[in-house]
Curated annotation (Swiss-Prot):
Protein name: Ribosomal protein L11 methyltransferase
Any one Gene Ontology BP term: methylation
SUPFAM superfamilies membership: S-adenosyl-L-methionine-dependent methyltransferases
Domain of life: Bacteria
Enzyme Commission code: 2.1.1.-
Location(s), subcellular: Cytoplasm
GO molecular function: protein-lysine N-methyltransferase activity
Length: 315
């Protein structure tokens, strides 16, 4: 079987939404060539576990690659992808060069080529993310391993927005907590919360593929009994009191459910937000404080910001 490799030259800001678009159109084997990864290896706080080849990366911007089966619908699928990407301009997302190209690859090339990009990565004090096909032995007794299949959906879980989210979970999740993951994607944050001791994790995503991916990855990590996954639009119709709510999505989406996050948090609970580009930081802060939240932590990585807010304890 022949496959078509679609390559999109864009910006770091556009990685997450374009990756989601590719998965929604049936693409497989997502690869992100981000030259900032080369800097992360040099400056890694926690120590990367692998080497990268600079020749694979663009000089500026990022390249997102994925694979589509070559069939009679390929042309329509590519046009659908281009149209969906251009729609991101509505959200004021910088698309950069926004160049789309196609090349033909054979199945045996496709089946192995993209795997060279994925190796175990230690992303916080306690958590290491590793692809399913890599053998990895923990280096300490308290190290927590999250296994992901990057070819299934939503990448590797090592994007700065995900790293910031997991570091937030590591700081604020306590054993026995109820955690909500809004916009769960691959389920990596839900898995992290469960491994950090959360008693229950409720994961929500509007995308059916994300729901399936979270369920599969939860089973892969043997924490599926703790993680309940539901197809849902943000927190619409949800009525529970969580200890922690985490959401790694666009700033414009976060501000749309700040009120629901407030309603579903216990007094003294934490709202961990990520996926926020620098120039949208104040937008999120303003909406959080207007609702009554207390912003207690701002964490940054490259152009991305994570904001942790607390619902004040009842007096």
């Amino acid at each position: 079987m022949k496959w078509s490799e679609i390559s999109i030259h864009t910006t770091n800001e556009a990685i997450e939404p374009i990756s989601n678009i590719l998965h929604e159109t049936g693409a497989s084997g997502l690869v992100i060539e981000d030259p900032l990864d080369l800097e992360r290896v040099e400056k890694a706080e926690f120590g990367e576990l692998y080497d990268l080849d600079p020749a694979l990366y663009p000089e500026e911007g990022v390249r997102i690659k994925a694979y589509l089966p070559m069939n009679s619908f390929l042309g329509e699928t590519v046009e659908e992808i281009k149209s969906a990407i251009n729609q991101l301009l509505i959200y004021d997302i910088d698309l950069g060069k926004n160049e789309v190209s196609l090349s033909e690859v054979h199945e045996e090339e496709w089946a192995t080529a993209w795997k060279k990009y994925y190796k175990p990565v230690k992303i916080s004090n306690r958590i290491t993310i590793t692809p399913t096909w890599e053998e990895y032995t923990p280096v300490s007794s308290d190290e927590l391993i999250i296994e992901l299949d990057p070819g299934m959906a939503f990448g590797t879980g090592t994007h700065p927005t995900t790293v910031l989210s997991i570091q937030g979970l590591e700081a604020y999740v306590k054993p026995g907590d109820l955690v909500m993951d809004v916009g769960c994607g691959s389920g990596v944050l839900s898995i992290a919360a469960a491994k950090l001791g959360a008693d229950k994790v409720n994961a929500y995503d509007l995308d059916e593929i994300a729901v399936k991916s979270t369920k599969l990855n939860s089973k892969l990590n043997q924490i599926h009994e703790s993680v309940k996954v539901k197809q849902n639009n943000l927190l619409e119709g949800v009525q529970q009191e969580a200890d922690v709510i985490v959401s790694n999505i666009l700033a414009e989406i976060i501000v749309r459910f700040v009120d629901d996050a407030w309603s579903n948090l216990k007094a003294g609970g934490y709202f961990i937000t990520s996926g926020i580009i620098q120039n949208k930081k104040q937008l999120v802060i303003d909406n959080l404080t207007k609702q009554g939240f207390e912003v207690i932590s701002l964490n940054e990585m490259e152009d991305w910001v994570s904001i942790v807010a607390k619902k004040p304890s009842e007096k």
